[in-house]
């Protein structure tokens, strides 16, 4: 039986910390930026750590054999 492939879409969007947490970029910065303050736009830069429930789902989907 061949090896299972990792999902490429998930591979491009998420990274893992050494302790197993999932890092993703901030959502909500593609459009409608006019109505936001400069501070809000600044805070949307960079990455964030997902909550444990979402991180578990990503790991289950990202790694074919699970953790």
From Swiss-Prot:
Signal sequence extent: none
Family statement drawn from the similarity comment of this UniProt entry: Belongs to the bacterial ribosomal protein bL35 family.
Identification of the protein by name: Large ribosomal subunit protein bL35
PANTHER family: 54S RIBOSOMAL PROTEIN BL35M (PTHR33343), LARGE RIBOSOMAL SUBUNIT PROTEIN BL35M (PTHR33343:SF1)
A GO MF label: structural constituent of ribosome
Gene Ontology biological process: translation
Gene name per UniProt: rpmI
Organism field: Rickettsia prowazekii (strain Madrid E)
SUPFAM superfamilies found in the cross-reference section: L35p-like
One GO CC term on file: cytosolic large ribosomal subunit
Keyword check for Ribosomal protein: yes
Pfam families found in the cross-reference section: Ribosomal_L35p
Keywords annotated in UniProt: Ribonucleoprotein, Ribosomal protein
